[in-house]
């Protein structure tokens, strides 16, 4: 067999494959034997008739075509294996010589990645710190999360920080527009209410209502699509106004969080914030390293691989919508897009994810990174012992698909660790005290889980809150950003 390989754009290769005369003669003989078993020639048992009689009965062309079919399949697979090519689409085949067989194949293949110069990438580690003001902010958030909501002694208009219970209705002409919000709870200054609604609420005492119009720009992406380009008539009714009674920040407050003293609480908050900042800094350094790696990498994505990724993304969304009781068709109608338009929107993201994956896999191969069976078993055992139900955990990870998922996670972790080690010259993504915290400092003894809230943005808790449906809430609240803030600023 003779093979000529030509690399074309978009990770496509052209293979010119020519069979040796001896190979083709052997393939003809095998084809003749297969066909002769199926042909009835008077005076001969199946498979016993002379070749000339069989050719006369079925035509030499059939035997040649059968030999070509078998030989093309085998030689094509051998050519791919010999040149380490992995097809990602069906090949286009052209036979340009019948005997001995010679044919041309064009096929999109798994792309090769060039990482020339990647070992010279450098990224500076981060040093992070926590200020007293940041600790104060978290303590204040914890304080507000334990607020007791009380009705003011005298009825009054609401102000920043007050909790309001309201009805919000919207009309398009005379007809109600979507489901109204009933007995919905908001905290003024902490909810992304439309500026007009926020201002109206602030002007009303309990039991009072206001009516007004809001016009939404066609291009305003901060509101839900069904509102864009419309002018709606709103009616807002305030039912209750409540003010927050906040606990004093002292040792008793700390004890309500499972910490002995206020000083210990501040130490715990500081350490948790430091860990959070260190994790964020590590993620930033890692992402910067990945972006630098992508910059030095050269890779051409085959269109078939991109289409496969887009199709997978569409099916993933379809399944997610199905689990929520919806459908892709309903989603597209809501977005006002066709399936092809939606796929076109997905394509740049799909290309970026594919390129990132391929480059990181090429880095792993260049660095000899792999997950051994011993490493996988050790990780399963570590997780099992930490789970509290080791036997059940081990049984769960004996399932091949689950085991494979964990192996992928370990692989990604090893790739990240090696990349960070390389770009920081072994110093790590963060340095100083944050590095020690990130390495896994244990929580202080006697600290209850409640104190973990210190590193999260707490929400104001009130047992009387009546949540609104997502579709109804879109009548009053921005989807992204803060339309209210922008409008008030202007």
Curated annotation (Swiss-Prot):
The protein's Enzyme Commission number: 5.2.1.8
Catalytic reaction(s) noted: [protein]-peptidylproline (omega=180) = [protein]-peptidylproline (omega=0)
Sorted UniProt keywords: Cell cycle, Cell division, Chaperone, Cytoplasm, Isomerase, Rotamase
Domain of life: Bacteria
Pfam family, any one: Trigger_C
Cell compartments where the protein resides: Cytoplasm
Recorded GO MF terms: peptidyl-prolyl cis-trans isomerase activity; protein folding chaperone; ribosome binding
Chief location: cytoplasm
Enzyme class: isomerase
Compositional bias of kind Polar residues: 466-481
Biased composition (Low complexity): 441-460
Record's function text: Involved in protein export. Acts as a chaperone by maintaining the newly synthesized protein in an open conformation. Functions as a peptidyl-prolyl cis-trans isomerase.
Record PANTHER family: TRIGGER FACTOR CHAPERONE AND PEPTIDYL-PROLYL CIS/TRANS ISOMERASE, TRIGGER FACTOR-LIKE PROTEIN TIG, CHLOROPLASTIC
Xref: NCBIfam families: tig
Protein family membership: Belongs to the FKBP-type PPIase family. Tig subfamily.
Entry text on domains: Consists of 3 domains; the N-terminus binds the ribosome, the middle domain has PPIase activity, while the C-terminus has intrinsic chaperone activity on its own.
Name of this chain's protein: Trigger factor
Lineage of the organism: Bacteria, Pseudomonadati, Thermomicrobiota, Thermomicrobia, Thermomicrobiales
Gene: tig
């Amino acid at each position: 067999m003779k093979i000529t390989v030509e690399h074309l754009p978009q990770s496509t290769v052209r293979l010119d494959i020519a069979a040796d005369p001896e190979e083709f003669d052997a393939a003809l003989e095998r084809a003749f034997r297969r066909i002769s078993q199926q042909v009835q020639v008077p005076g001969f048992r199946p498979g016993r008739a002379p070749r000339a009689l069989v050719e006369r009965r079925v035509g030499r062309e059939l035997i040649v075509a059968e030999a070509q079919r078998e030989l093309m399949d085998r030689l094509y697979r051998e050519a791919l294996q010999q040149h380490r090519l992995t097809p990602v689409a069906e090949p286009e085949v052209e036979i340009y010589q019948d005997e001995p067989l010679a044919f041309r194949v064009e096929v999109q293949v798994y792309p090769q990645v060039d990482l020339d110069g990647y070992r010279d990438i450098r990224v500076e580690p981060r040093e992070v710190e926590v200020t007293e003001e940041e600790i104060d902010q978290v303590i204040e958030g914890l304080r507000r999360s334990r607020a007791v909501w009380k009705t003011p002694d005298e009825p009054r208009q609401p102000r920043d920080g007050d909790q309001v219970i309201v009805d919000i209705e919207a009309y398009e002409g005379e007809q109600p527009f979507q489901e109204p919000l009933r007995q919905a709870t908001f905290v003024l200054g902490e909810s992304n209410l439309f500026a007009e609604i926020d201002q109206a609420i602030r002007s009303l005492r309990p039991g009072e209502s206001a009516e007004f119009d809001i016009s939404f720009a066609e291009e305003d992406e901060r509101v839900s699509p069904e509102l864009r380009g419309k002018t709606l008539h709103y009616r807002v009714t305030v039912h209750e106004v409540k003010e927050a009674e906040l606990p004093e920040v002292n040792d008793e407050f700390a004890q309500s969080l499972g910490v002995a003293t206020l000083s210990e609480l501040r130490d715990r908050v500081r350490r948790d914030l430091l860990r959070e900042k260190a994790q964020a800094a590590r993620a930033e350094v890692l992402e910067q390293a990945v972006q630098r790696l992508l910059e030095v990498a050269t890779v051409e994505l085959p269109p078939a691989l991109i289409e496969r990724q887009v199709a997978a993304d569409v099916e993933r969304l379809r399944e997610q919508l199905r689990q929520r009781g919806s459908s892709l068709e309903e989603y597209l109608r809501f977005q006002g897009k066709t399936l092809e338009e939606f796929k076109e929107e997905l394509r740049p993201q799909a290309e970026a994810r594919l390129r990132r994956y391929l480059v990181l896999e090429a880095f792993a191969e260049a660095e000899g990174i792999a997950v051994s069976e011993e490493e996988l078993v050790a990780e399963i055992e570590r997780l099992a012992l930490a789970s509290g139900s080791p036997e059940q955990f081990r049984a769960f990870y004996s399932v091949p698909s689950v085991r494979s998922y964990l192996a992928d996670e370990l692989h990604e972790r090893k790739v990240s660790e090696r990349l960070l080690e390389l770009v920081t010259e072994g110093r790590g993504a963060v340095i100083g005290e944050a590095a020690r915290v990130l390495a896994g400092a244990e929580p202080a003894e006697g600290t209850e889980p409640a104190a973990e809230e210190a590193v999260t943005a707490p929400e104001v808790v009130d047992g009387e809150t009546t949540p609104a449906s997502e579709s109804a809430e879109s009548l009053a609240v921005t989807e992204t950003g803060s339309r209210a803030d922008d409008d008030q600023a202007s």
